[in-house]
């Protein structure tokens, strides 16, 4: 269970560091944008969920300068930092938890980069987002999959078994695999009567390299993405052994590796074929 207060604190206090360290997240934002196929001639209504510093918001504005963009984030520090970067009247920022917020507007595009892993109720949130789409609107998001930080999790479990520690408080966030995420999405889509969805999934692995494990862990903290689970405990002996194993197993040419498993999903909401026939008959 994600503790949202801890999450807010982590991201708020690291807003100024984020863009300097979030190299993978920036690459994901560009990949997600490249997957979109929307009419650039019309004025779009866009919701940017988990906008952070506004990096993706800026990409959206560059592509659709006339779009009306609502950018939201749970962290006040992120919203404050993002607001200072934009002067455009067609971009509005709000500090909101999307899992708690009510969406009273319909959007052509609901987009979210590297945020879905922080939701406690993924299915409920996906349902809320697709309900807010206009007909022919698109939900597009990227998130992290189960192979993310696989080196860290392997080293932690190996150290825990070696030291015979029964308690399980992993050092990093655990992530769903792509099949689980897609299944949740498809079950949600199937529950929306009168609509069908064209869905595309893409996966990739990205790697970062560091001189030490502590440098890697520090880089995660610098973007506020360290563990926000409740009941997080620190065992000094376990941490020390975990780092030793990590550097022994995953250090090549003087550098340790960290894996990011990136998942991208886009889905277009359309009137179902039988609904379209009914609409045409009425017309």
Curated annotation (Swiss-Prot):
Keywords: Biotin biosynthesis, Methyltransferase, S-adenosyl-L-methionine, Transferase. GO terms for biological process: biotin biosynthetic process; methylation. GO terms for molecular function: carboxyl-O-methyltransferase activity; malonyl-CoA methyltransferase activity. It comes from the Bacteria. Its EC number is 2.1.1.197. It catalyses: malonyl-[ACP] + S-adenosyl-L-methionine = malonyl-[ACP] methyl ester + S-adenosyl-L-homocysteine. CDD domains: AdoMet_MTases. Pfam families: Methyltransf_25 (PF13649). Gene3D superfamilies: Vaccinia Virus protein VP39 (3.40.50.150). This is Malonyl-[acyl-carrier protein] O-methyltransferase. Belongs to the methyltransferase superfamily. Pathway: Cofactor biosynthesis; biotin biosynthesis. Converts the free carboxyl group of a malonyl-thioester to its methyl ester by transfer of a methyl group from S-adenosyl-L-methionine (SAM). It allows to synthesize pimeloyl-ACP via the fatty acid synthetic pathway. Signal peptide: none annotated. It comes from Acetivibrio thermocellus (strain ATCC 27405 / DSM 1237 / JCM 9322 / NBRC 103400 / NCIMB 10682 / NRRL B-4536 / VPI 7372). The lineage of its organism: Bacteria, Bacillati, Bacillota, Clostridia, Eubacteriales.
